[in-house]
């Protein structure tokens, strides 16, 4: 029997709700068709936003949405996306499929979407091909309430009051598609550009996000922090509130990646092993951040994460459309448990991407919509949002097929909500073994337990023909004991228990 020990009274760090954030890019069917269908569409919508998608995202309590990219951000010129839609400039989306971008979804539409979702806004600015003035004017257009050229332009375009801008990314992947810069050059550009990302509302300031590393480029993290911190007052923390990190699971590597649906046991464990590498990245980048920011004033912002496979057969390679199986449910559960466990440093994360792209929570086909296994994991984990991480540990054993890609059989994280409920989330990575869990809750009287679970065979998925193949089901097989609870977690599953 496996032992899980939980100390509800030993609170460690707040699990920011923003850890459960999402990412939407102008990557063909993510924004267009997936979220925005236009006011004249036969698909039910409110001001052009699909009502089915909006309601589904509200259900999982989407806390924050990042936009417009991604690589698209550093070629996006925001003034092309305001004003009458019939006069907006068209452009070629050179990064994603070479298709025409008509800019019908722009700043006003994004903030309309955030208002419908009830979520915070994370805008990524253009440092790669844009000017300091362009970035400065965008922030002014969005947030300034008084009399100014940009505020007047916003009012002329139909929005009298400014919007609340919570997060602003000063460039994206500037080590790659955002300009192929070296870390010192980018850091100095960051210092210049961020100066003009002005906080016009001290009562709700903009949180500035600096472009961080790709995967394990620890030199980038070190050099960017060194340059930004050596040229400003210590208490300003490099003039940043967050430092980003991007990491994707590519089962077979960057060039081949591998199929989203056709994989064997070896690739299953290899994929989960790569998902677990997120913890190593957080710890090693976090150690460098600790040198310059021991008080953890700068949040680690994992604003692109998830599984990235070879696109579905017959689809445009530049649209990054892929299916979603129980493997993705496990990747999501594993990763979110890691984020929770490191919530002292990880302050926001954004799954890539929200609809129809990469490890999305929703897939659409015309008027039809399905919820992916990943969606259902976010649905179960939503109770961790803004709860307090508590001390917990679980006994594990090593499993797998190939020696190089071994994994622990279980992962977990536990939080206590404001109402006192204890929320336990566990993943069983095994393809063939259930585990009986003896759970000890120290100094805690268990009165009631509710459970829910997502589980199935590794290839199970939701399709437009079978949209409910994978879904959240009640889990009632929990026994109360003198020391806590006892239950058995099935193979290939993600489980949530609420204990009161």
Regions found by a protein language model. Give the residues of each.
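Histidine-centered active-site/metal-ligand motif
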Residues: 246
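Phosphate/diphosphate-binding loops
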Residues: 274
């Amino acid at each position: 029997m496996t032992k899980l020990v939980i100390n509800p009274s030993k609170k460690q760090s707040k699990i920011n709700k923003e850890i459960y954030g999402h990412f939407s890019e102008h990557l063909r069917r993510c924004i267009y068709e997936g979220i925005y269908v236009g006011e004249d569409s036969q698909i039910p919508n409110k001001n052009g936003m699909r009502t089915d998608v909006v309601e589904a995202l509200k259900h999982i309590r989407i806390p924050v949405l990042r936009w417009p990219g991604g690589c698209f951000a550093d070629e996006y010129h925001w003034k092309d996306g305001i004003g009458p839609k019939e006069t907006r400039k068209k452009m070629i989306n050179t990064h994603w499929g070479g298709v025409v971008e008509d800019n019908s979804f722009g700043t006003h539409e994004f903030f309309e979407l955030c208002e419908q979702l009830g979520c915070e806004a994370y805008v990524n600015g253009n440092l790669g091909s844009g000017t300091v003035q362009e970035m400065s004017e965008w922030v002014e257009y969005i947030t300034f309430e008084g009399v100014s050229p940009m505020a007047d332009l916003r009012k002329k375009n139909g929005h009298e009051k400014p919007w609340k801008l919570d997060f602003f990314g000063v460039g994206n992947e500037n080590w790659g598609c955002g300009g192929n810069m070296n870390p010192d050059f980018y850091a100095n550009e960051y210092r210049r550009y961020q100066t003009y990302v002005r906080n016009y509302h001290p009562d709700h300031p903009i949180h500035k996000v600096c472009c961080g590393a790709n995967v394990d480029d620890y030199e980038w993290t070190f050099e960017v922090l060194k340059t930004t911190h050596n040229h400003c007052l210590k208490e300003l923390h490099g003039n940043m509130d967050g430092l980003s990190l991007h990491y994707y699971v590519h089962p077979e590597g960057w060039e081949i990646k591998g199929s989203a649906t056709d994989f064997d046991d070896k690739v299953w464990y290899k994929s989960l092993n790569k998902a677990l590498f997120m913890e190593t990245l957080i710890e090693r980048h976090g150690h460098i951040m600790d040198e310059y920011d021991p008080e953890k004033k700068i949040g680690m912002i994992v604003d692109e994460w998830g599984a990235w496979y070879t696109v579905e057969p017959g689809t445009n390679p530049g649209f990054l459309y892929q299916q979603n199986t129980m493997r993705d449910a496990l990747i999501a559960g594993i990763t979110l448990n890691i984020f929770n466990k490191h919530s002292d440093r990880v302050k926001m994360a954004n799954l890539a991407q929200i609809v129809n792209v990469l490890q999305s929570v929703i897939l659409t086909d015309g008027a039809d919509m399905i919820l992916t296994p990943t969606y259902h994991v976010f649905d179960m984990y939503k109770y961790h949002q803004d709860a307090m991480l508590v001390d917990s540990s679980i006994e594990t054993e090593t499993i797998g097929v190939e020696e190089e890609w071994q994994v622990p059989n279980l992962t977990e994280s536990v939080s206590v909500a404001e109402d006192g409920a204890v929320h336990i989330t566990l993943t069983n990575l095994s393809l063939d073994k259930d585990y009986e869990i003896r759970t000890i809750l120290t100094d805690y009287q268990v009165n009631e337990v509710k459970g829910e679970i997502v589980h199935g065979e590794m290839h199970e998925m939701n399709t437009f023909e079978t949209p409910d193949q994978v879904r959240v089901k009640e889990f009632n097989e929990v026994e109360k004991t003198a020391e806590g609870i006892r239950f058995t977690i099935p193979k290939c599953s993600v489980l949530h228990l609420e204990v009161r």
